[in-house]
Amino acid sequence: MSETPYYETMYILRPDIPEEEVDSHLKKYSAILEKSETEVLDSQMRGKRRLAYPIAKHKEGIYVQLSHKGNGQQVATLERAMRLSEDVIRYITVKQDGPLPTPKPTSKEDETEKEEVKPTEDKTESPAQEEKKEDSKE
């Protein structure tokens, strides 16, 4: 018998729903998967992002990613629940060859640390600067 396939479901929620409701959606869809005897490997909230084009008159959306392992029948159940939800504006499920490594979410703190790093100043003077100093001494 072959190995159980891996799946990754990415869905976009309306941008105007509160964070508590986003968490309840994540728990709801994880529970649907667990009820159909599927192992939820990872769930990540990717945050609010601008959409490439408007979807249902929304220019932004809250991205959520679910990685799961199962027999494939759970995908239809999960996607049906998402299709019936008014809060989900788009979803997609992709079959993976194996478990994907969990990407580390980038935080604003990491970005500010990168910006704060300044190049060291070169204390030696270039020949052009030395000539200017000599001219000013005369």
From Swiss-Prot:
GO CC terms of this entry: cytoplasm; ribonucleoprotein complex; ribosome
Keyword terms: Ribonucleoprotein, Ribosomal protein, RNA-binding, rRNA-binding
Compositionally skewed regions (Basic and acidic residues) per UniProt: 106-138
Example of a GO MF term: small ribosomal subunit rRNA binding
Keyword Ribosomal protein listed: yes
Pfam families linked: Ribosomal_S6 (PF01250)
Chain intervals for the UniProt region annotation (Disordered): 94-138
Gene3D superfamilies, A to Z: 3.30.70.60
Gene Ontology BP annotations: translation
Source domain of life: Bacteria
SUPFAM superfamilies recorded: Ribosomal protein S6
Function: Binds together with bS18 to 16S ribosomal RNA.
Family: Belongs to the bacterial ribosomal protein bS6 family.
Classification via PANTHER family: MITOCHONDRIAL 28S RIBOSOMAL PROTEIN S6, SMALL RIBOSOMAL SUBUNIT PROTEIN BS6M
Protein name in UniProt: Small ribosomal subunit protein bS6
Organism annotation: Prochlorococcus marinus (strain NATL1A)
